[in-house]
Amino acid sequence: MDLDLTGRIVVVTGASRGIGLAVTRAFVAEGARVVAGARSTTPELAALADGGSVIVVEVDLSTHDGPGALVAAAGPRVDVLVNNVGSAHPRPDGFLEITDEMWRATLELDLMASVRAVRAVVPIMRAYGGGAIVNIGSVNARLPDPLVLDYSAAKAAAGSMAKSLSKELGPHGIRVNSVDPGPVATDLWLGKGGVADVVGGAHGASPEDVAAGAAASMVTGRFTRPEEVADVVLVLASTRFGNVTGSNVVIDGGLITTL
């Protein structure tokens, strides 16, 4: 199926690794041009830029001006915005140990980066008659977990924002949808200092055992691959699915068992 993404201008936040890198690769494979925002350039992202279809913008997306600077680097037109940047920091010591500074850092990256990117891109999309915004959320938006309490709260807020935006922006031809992954095979979960590493250290377990336990909680018995999340993003960004807005697609291997 031709997703009609050839020549589209796409802005991706948090594009240097994990889901963001997979999303960037997927859009390039479909013939899109990607403006990729990241705090620093990884070799994988640099290799994509060498191909000529990716412009890398090194930017701190947790700052007030960062998201706007990224959108501005795309030029006068943006067809798709993918709000992917985010980070989950496990809090094994509980709620009382989450300081105001920790709350602010989480909200700046996991919520306000998306708010600011949308604020920057909406006037551009309205001028061109429409566009698509895809927010990468988390199952923790609907499965609040004290281990990632501040992250869960931020993702719940981002999901609510996306639903509200879909109603406001729909008449302007701008579709807004969310993707909520469960555990994904990225450094956020499996890398040094990731969820499995921190949780294992707090409970005297190996990261491998923590990851295996998480995988066992899914009916598929495995983590989602970043490329699988990217494929969902492509569908939601495509004009072939032009009447899909305000939707939330969960890709969690059956982790959520409720209706």
Show where each model-derived region lies.
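Conserved glycine-rich cofactor-binding loop
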Residues: 9, 16-17
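Active-site helix of classical SDR
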Residues: 118, 154, 162
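Short, small/polar-rich loop/turn modules that mediate ligand/substrate recognition or access, typified
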Residues: 170, 175, 244-246
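Alpha-helical segment proximal to the catalytic Tyr-Lys
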Residues: 123, 167-168, 242
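Residue(s) in the substrate-gating loop at a strand-loop-helix junction
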Residues: 138
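Substrate-binding pocket helix/loop in short-chain dehydrogenase/reductase
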Residues: 91-95, 99-107, 133, 199, ...
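Short C-terminal tail/terminal secondary-structure segment
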Residues: 92, 143, 222, 233-234, ...
